[in-house]
């Protein structure tokens, strides 16, 4: 019995402790006792020069050179987790596959944030500024690192669409047309202007102030009835660059509402007071209007230079597609009223016909 016990003990020690195994790594055979743990084997061979991965911030910067995933070990294709290395022994000959650790990104929170739309606004091409594409905010995923406290932009969920505004100088091919426009009305002079236009079978565009529209609703209704175009010139003629975005929007929204109430016309055509409407104003208000119409022939009638000078400014500088600025309100417009018949007469003599802003844009394919 003693001999059997000693023999069994010797066999056990040989089988599980003294026996030499052949462990192949990277094509090279290494010897290891049967009681060698994976941890000891890796330590004895310096992890076969494999390194753990790095711990990276959400921005991809190294926070800890060895803070990433540990070296990966497989024995005959079976994964051995790092937590099991200390109590996993080799029981047979085999192949150990050792893979460097992979990088690990720090723990982080994931947020979805609005990405404000960009702008592509060119206001140097002519007097008619048109929205060709509305801006739309994008949506993007952002990671906020718990260790680094940094924020990194990641997956784009919805791409932002830029606000595109282009400006044009309408020149209808094969035509000789002109757009007469009147600002600051309606007023006590509006009916006189409308009488002249009617007598001469001429159409025009009226950029009206909301507060004036409410005061003269019958004039607004006559403008529409006789085939002219009504558009907005704000409520009270403020200087937009000095206003907050909220104030600007309120001014335009109120003017559109006033015009609708007085004339039953819904318009998205606008002329900024003083022509002061730049990139910031477009960014603030592009969802309210489709066009901002300036001018390229200015009569300067608001200075009251005399009816002959007002007429001369138009006749001397007229061209196909011209947008002429005149005033039907905002002060004494008697000179404008007196000049208008002669302006129409001379322009007709030159072969011009008269159109509204809507008609001009349509003729020019805008």
Predicted segments with their positions:
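Hydrophobic membrane-insertion alpha-helices, especially the h-region
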Residues: 1-11
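Ser/Thr/Pro/Gly-rich low-complexity linker/stalk segments immediately outside membranes or between
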Residues: 13-30
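Short, recurring structural edge motifs at helix starts
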Residues: 26-32, 58-59, 82-85
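LysM (lysin motif) carbohydrate-binding repeats in extracellular/periplasmic proteins that recognize
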Residues: 34, 39-70, 74-76
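N-terminal pre-catalytic segment of deacetylase/amide-hydrolase enzymes
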Residues: 60-70, 75, 85-179, 188-191, ...
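Solvent-exposed coil/turn segments that connect beta secondary-structure elements
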Residues: 76-78, 101-103, 185, 211, ...
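Active-site beta->alpha N-cap acidic-glycine motif
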Residues: 152-239, 243, 247-258
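Catalytic domains of cell-wall/extracellular-matrix polysaccharide-remodeling enzymes
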Residues: 215, 238-353, 358-366
